[in-house]
């Protein structure tokens, strides 16, 4: 499918706006592990994912990563165009978790259209509100939910994304997602293994008891 099929506001644009986007649209293929945007880069623009998977995260003062949210096929990333939204005051990094094909609408192009189009402005505000809701939910999890529940939730989410209970993922990667230390995650996973919830092997975690993990995350 083409960009027009992926961009939800295409039919709300006038002919001139459609031409402006088409003339300036950037198509990009990025490899797994590529940093697409970080707080020190210029305003990248609006990202629309054709296929693949991105992770948006922040860095603590100690250099620890914590995932804000992940993006999948047909998702739109606004934080990569933070310069057009004055309310965004924090720096984020966006990384490709898988090989990803995406489109980029340059920030100035999108900003101009947003000023002239009420549907685009409304959609942008709604999407930003959704993302901030995701971030507030994450903060609530960090503050009030114990680490064992957060690890259980992460493993179940990862299994759902990958479509398998055999997860090719390192303890360091989980720590980066959850804003923790690798050693702490390793101890928790070893505890899970002792309880028969998972099986650990080099570079892989196999979920053995999804139902008990679900019970744990809800408790």
Q: Which role fits each region the language model picked out?
A:
Residues 97-98, 115-180:
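Polybasic "coupling" helices that flank or enter modular domains
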Residues 61-68:
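Short alpha-helix-to-loop micro-motif enriched in aromatics/charged/Gly
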Residues 1-31, 71, 76, 81-85:
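Cyclic nucleotide-binding regulatory module and flanking cytosolic helices
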Residues 69-125:
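Cyclic-nucleotide recognition modules
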Residues 147, 156-219:
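Phosphate-/nucleic-acid-contacting segments
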Residues 36-41:
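Short phosphate-coordinating micro-motif centered on Lys-Gly-acidic
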Residues 33, 44-57, 72-74:
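Glycine- and acidic-residue-biased ligand/ion/polar-headgroup-sensing regions
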């Amino acid at each position: 499918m083409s960009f027009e099929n992926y961009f939800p506001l295409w039919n709300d644009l006038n002919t001139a706006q459609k031409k402006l986007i088409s003339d300036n649209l950037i198509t990009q293929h990025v490899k797994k592990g590529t940093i697409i945007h970080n707080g020190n880069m210029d305003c990248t623009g609006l990202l629309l994912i054709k296929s693949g998977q991105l992770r948006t995260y922040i860095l603590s003062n100690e250099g620890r990563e914590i995932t804000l949210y992940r993006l999948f096929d047909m998702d739109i990333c606004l934080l990569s165009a933070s310069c057009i939204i004055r309310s965004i005051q924090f720096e984020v990094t966006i990384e490709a978790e898988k090989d990803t094909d995406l489109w980029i609408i340059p920030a100035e192009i999108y900003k101009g259209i947003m000023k002239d189009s009420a549907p685009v402005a409304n959609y942008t505000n709604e999407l930003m509100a959704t993302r901030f809701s995701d971030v507030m939910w994450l903060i609530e999890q960090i503050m009030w939910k114990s680490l064992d529940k957060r690890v259980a939730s992460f493993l179940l989410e990862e299994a759902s994304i990958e479509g398998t209970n055999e997860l090719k993922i390192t303890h360091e990667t989980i720590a980066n997602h959850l804003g923790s230390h690798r050693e702490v995650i390793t101890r928790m996973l070893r505890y899970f293994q002792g309880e028969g919830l998972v099986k650990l092997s080099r570079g892989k975690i196999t979920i053995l008891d999804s139902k008990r993990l679900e019970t744990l995350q809800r408790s």
